[in-house]
Amino acid sequence: QGTSVAAARRLSDFTMPRDVSAYASDNAAKLAAIQALYAAQSGRPGRWRELGDSGSATFRCMDVFPAASRLYLSDRASWSAGYDTMALGTGRDLREVAKAIYARESGDQRVQAFTFRVDNGGYDTHSDQGGADPAGQHWTLHAEVGAALKHFFDDLADMGGGLDQRVTVVAWSEFSRRVRQNDSGTDHGSQGPMFVVGGGVNGGIYGNHPNIAASDLGSDGNTRYRQGAHDFRSTDVRDVFGTVLVRWLGIPESEVLDPVSGLLRLDDGAADTRWTAADFDLRRGADGATLFRA
């Protein structure tokens, strides 16, 4: 079964459509009546209760997030304008994240969102990838992400409270590009880089660079996971997300690694399941007191 979620492009859009006709004066009464219908289901069993709880949660979001948007736009107008100046979708999406963080840091405990996802598309560059050309497709996409992230972290730093130290961004793609060129582009790859950004990150390069020598590529032009006894996988995506779950979000490692119900499989020694670094730790320092959740 799927899970339905309420979604809006911008926090300010998180509201119920209002009647703008001659009956607009009834809007408040209509909203109150709908809220009452959802609230009445909270004491009922099964799906009725789930429906009521979901509806009530949606109305709470309608109170919280548009207010968070207004607060940010009022207090941080110049920073908001900076996102617009970039004219980049990624920047404008990160501004919505900044709004929620700022509201929480300003004391609105109703904001309970601690993880966010922002998409940046266009990387399926089978053609016209552009190489090292600053006007090329691939270069432009990376420049967009870089500019947006810089402004976002500068915004957080200016908010105070060490937010630029406490907020962490993981940038990754569900597929990468292969080494062998396909005319003017590249096809889907077997491995790719991830970036972890934030003041709390123990910076550096984790894992070995994959072997990209032409003689060591597979017949399809992809890097290999293994060649004989040599492991080319370098770093497992689970190393990165496992570290974030445990060291930033404070989820007990036993829950993350539980072999039956955990989020990630335990290392059983097999090449296709093991973590590549048992002590993989991106986080600077030992305590979790600086988590954004705190």
Q: Where does each model-flagged region fall?
A:
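Feature for exported/extracytoplasmic and membrane-associated proteins, marking the mature portion
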Residues: 1-146, 154-159, 206-210, 214-294
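Metal-dependent active-site segment of extracytoplasmic phospho-/sulfohydrolases and closely related
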Residues: 149, 153-183
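Structural recognition of the beta-strand scaffold that forms the well-ordered cores
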Residues: 114-117, 168-171, 193-196
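Short gly/pro-enriched beta-turn/loop segments at secondary-structure junctions
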Residues: 109-113, 164-165, 189
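Histidine-centered active-site microenvironments of extracellular/periplasmic hydrolases
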Residues: 173-206
